[in-house]
Amino acid sequence: APETFAICLSFSINFNKIMNIAIVGATGNVGRKILEVLEKKELAIDNLYLLASSRSAGSKINFNGNEHEVIDLETFDFSKVKITFFAAGGKISENFAEIAAKHSLVIDNSSFYRMDPDVPLIVPQVNSDHLNNIKKNIIANPNCSTAQLVIALKPLHDLFKIKRIVVSTYQSVSGGGKAPMDELIEQTKQALEKNKIKSKNFTKQIAFNAIPHIDVFADDGYTKEELKMTNETKKILDNDIDLTATCVRLPVLVSHSESVNIEFEKSFTLEKVREALNNFEGCKVVDERADGGYSTPLEAEGKDETFISRIREDKTVTNGLNMWIVSDNLLRGAALNAVEIAETLIKNNFYGK
């Protein structure tokens, strides 16, 4: 469990009084999931403000049995709230997060602030101690594929010290938003009906296919998604870890999967690996060496846990381990992690400087 610690902000917030929360991007995939998680967690929210673009303003969203009208982000007064969740992409965070952070604590799901040295990048079960000095009143949520990875790596790194990781991801289309999900369904229908397919949100046909390309290419041949995994894992867990990634988009609606090869500095036993994972908050081992004795994206959808399967030694390298990691990218990789950051702050009674 996360340690108890003092959290300092540049202004004072007292959570023992009124709890007002805003969600920027409330109509999107992650924004709606944040609402679901908040309902499930039963946090004592006094006033909830749902923010989106002017196109969505005026629409209604249900929360805890009550309808809430969506408000235009550009006209909102952030002094009304204590925590603001941003779930609307990097450009919106770039333009509005620092405005919100003048009055509230910002928890940002976009990539914009993740590598900012003055912004902590947080998975509460892994590095909540990094919350002890929040300089910009902004906390970053990691990339969805990184979040589930570091949850599984943390207990093993603590015991055996990780030297190097090779990870291949099998990522669902929901990582790109609602439009790619709708397109996968439409492309699947078109393919089954033998109709011509024209991709809108993908570089190639996604139905019945696999695309080894997520986000833009860098000069060295890696994609931005792959570089995110490398850089974010180092920032969250340990800068000395070497990590190389290949990220692939699959025709799956929800949940990301990862094939992970780890080289440790210390020797291990599979029994100790399983025990460490099972005892770590947020992890669940499903690893029977039999038909169906492993987790898949379908089983992970809607679940809070990160599931670890196919745990086995890599006998081609000293102290090598292989495993398969699956998690709901909209929950563990985004909404759930963001809400757990807020919970951690509330439990530790963060205060102003």
PLM-predicted stretches and their roles:
Residues N14-N16:
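Intrinsic-disorder-associated, low-complexity terminal segments enriched in Asp/Asn/His/Tyr and depleted
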Residues T84, V173-K353:
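Charged docking surfaces used in two-component/phosphorelay signaling
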Residues I18-I206, D242, T306-F307, I311-V317, ...:
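N-terminal Rossmann-like NAD(P) cofactor-binding subdomain of oxidoreductases
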